[in-house]
């Protein structure tokens, strides 16, 4: 591996993108692009990553397990329901025990506070694979996808339309960090968390990014380079049928995308519900790069894993 240096990160864990600098993010993306071209780099030979899941997963589980195999290591699936933690063992005790057995933890769960405690009590790296508040690995892959398309973040406008959820939160922090212009359009009452917006705005002041929270989807996508959406019903929210009516004006369809640049690209973190948050014409059309985006989860996470594991080795 002579062409690209492993990024040096000033953190043991990745819980949100707030923990990374712009330079660290760009280094991770460039390293991820290198690993995408050189899939079988045994940089984590013999390392074990524990994968704790309290939520269903396709992309997160497969990309982390495949990534560890390609790096020469092993991903160990740990069902949250089957672990003693599911029967009352404390997060703190679980963290200390796992630190004796394995080299890193990826956790996909509900409570962000639990992930913070797990990281605090672990002597090994902890990666947030998704909580109710944040999805940093997704946002890192999204930035990689945008960077591959444009080779820059300067002057790029990303429009997020839909529910101000965990993906939206991580994209706000990501866009602020790298200096992008991000607009968010949601129905009233479904805006992103106010504290996270404040953090993004504070970061944007330092980086020159522009962050706008709107309720008008046409205004949000006006002259956008990238349009992004997510499902209207997150896991555990199924049955809130009134949301469908409220969110209908926020569907990504041929009429709405007329307001974006002609060269716009469509992004979605998947899984998608066609004819709800996006029409089939858009997600399956020529402007969509959602499967390239999904593929980049693998490469971005591999870059993150190598960087965090190597960082811990150097510190110890």
From Swiss-Prot:
Cellular localisation: Cytoplasm
BP GO annotations: arginine biosynthetic process via ornithine; arginine catabolic process to ornithine; citrulline biosynthetic process
PANTHER family: ORNITHINE CARBAMOYLTRANSFERASE, MITOCHONDRIAL, ORNITHINE TRANSCARBAMYLASE, MITOCHONDRIAL
Pathway involvement of the protein, from the record: Amino-acid degradation; L-arginine degradation via ADI pathway; carbamoyl phosphate from L-arginine: step 2/2
UniProt-recorded name of the protein: Ornithine carbamoyltransferase
Keywords for this protein: Arginine metabolism, Cytoplasm, Transferase
Main function: Reversibly catalyzes the transfer of the carbamoyl group from carbamoyl phosphate (CP) to the N(epsilon) atom of ornithine (ORN) to produce L-citrulline.
GO MF, any single term: ornithine carbamoyltransferase activity
Cellular component, GO annotation: cytoplasm
Protein family membership: Belongs to the aspartate/ornithine carbamoyltransferase superfamily. OTCase family.
Naturally occurring in which organism (per UniProt): Bacillus cereus (strain AH187)
EC number annotated for this UniProt entry: 2.1.3.3
């Amino acid at each position: 591996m002579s062409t690209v240096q492993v990024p040096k990160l000033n953190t043991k864990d990745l819980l949100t993108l707030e923990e990374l600098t712009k330079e660290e993010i760009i280094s991770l993306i460039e390293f991820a692009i290198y690993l995408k071209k050189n899939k079988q780099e045994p940089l984590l030979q013999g390392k074990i990553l524990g994968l704790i899941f309290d939520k269903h997963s396709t992309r997160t589980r497969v990309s982390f397990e495949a990534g560890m195999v390609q790096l020469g290591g092993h991903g160990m699936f740990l069902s949250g329901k089957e672990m003693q933690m599911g029967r009352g063992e404390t997060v703190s005790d679980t963290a200390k025990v796992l630190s004796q057995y394995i080299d890193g933890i990826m956790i996909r769960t509900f409570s962000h506070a639990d992930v913070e405690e797990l990281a605090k009590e672990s002597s090994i790296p902890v990666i947030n694979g998704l909580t109710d508040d944040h999805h940093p690995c997704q946002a890192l892959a999204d930035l990689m996808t945008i960077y591959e398309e444009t080779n820059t973040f300067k002057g790029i406008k990303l429009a997020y339309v839909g529910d101000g959820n965990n993906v939206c939160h991580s994209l706000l922090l990501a866009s602020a960090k790298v200096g992008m212009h991000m607009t968010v359009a949601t129905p009233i009452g479904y805006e992103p968390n106010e504290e996270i917006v404040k953090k993004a705005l504070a970061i944007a002041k330092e980086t020159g990014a522009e962050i706008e929270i709107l309720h008008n989807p046409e205004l949000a996508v006006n002259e956008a380079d990238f349009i992004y959406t997510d499902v209207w019903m997150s896991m555990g929210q199924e049955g809130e049928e009134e949301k469908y009516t409220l969110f209908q004006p926020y569907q990504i369809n041929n009429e709405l995308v007329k307001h974006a640049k002609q060269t716009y690209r469509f992004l979605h973190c998947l899984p998608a519900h066609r004819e709800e948050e996006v029409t089939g014409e858009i997600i399956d059309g020529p402007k969509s790069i959602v499967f390239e985006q999904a593929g980049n989860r693998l490469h971005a996470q591999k870059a993150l894993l190598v960087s965090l594991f190597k960082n811990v080795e150097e510190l110890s």
